[in-house]
Design a protein with these regions (language model features):
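Short metal-coordination and nucleic-acid-contact micro-motifs, chiefly zinc-binding Cys/His arrays
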Residues: 14-18, 38
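Short, charged, amphipathic alpha-helical segments
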Residues: 92-103, 127
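Amphipathic alpha-helical coiled-coil segments
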Residues: 104-122
């Protein structure tokens, strides 16, 4: 798999890339513009220069990681509630059947939050910025 087609800097017409639009997840085409600049366009019409595409990808990654944190926290809460329900109705076993899953999901939440607390999941800052 490649992100940019090998002939992108020689081609004049748009080329399909191996990356998706950060706004709609549609396939991006890349087109060379004057002075060797690249412009990315999806089928819906979203158009981005390289710096806009990188910023959009970074924001998408961060949003997706936060969605993962929320989903895992909901899983921990649900499993905890199921454990409580089971124990109130005499169905709990020693160690609870969901304890391992709760511990794993809680650990994943901790690790994702550590990444997100570093400010950005991916640092795409260019030297001199």
């Amino acid at each position: 798999m490649y992100a940019l087609p090998p002939d992108v800097f020689e081609a004049f017409e748009p080329r399909v890339t191996g990356i998706t639009c950060p706004e709609c997840a549609g396939v991006l085409e890349v087109q060379r513009e004057g002075h060797g600049n690249l412009r990315f366009i999806c089928r819906v019409g979203h158009t981005q220069a390289v710096d806009e595409l990188l910023a959009g990808k970074e924001d998408k990654i961060e949003n997706d990681l936060w969605a993962g944190v929320r989903a895992l926290e909901e899983l921990v809460a649900l499993l905890g509630d199921l454990e409580t329900y089971a124990s109130r109705h005499g169905r709990v076993q020693t160690g609870g059947p969901h304890d391992r899953r709760i511990a794993q999901a809680s650990d994943h939440v901790r690790r994702l939050r550590a990444i997100l607390d570093e400010k950005r999941p991916v640092d795409l800052a260019v030297a001199g910025e």
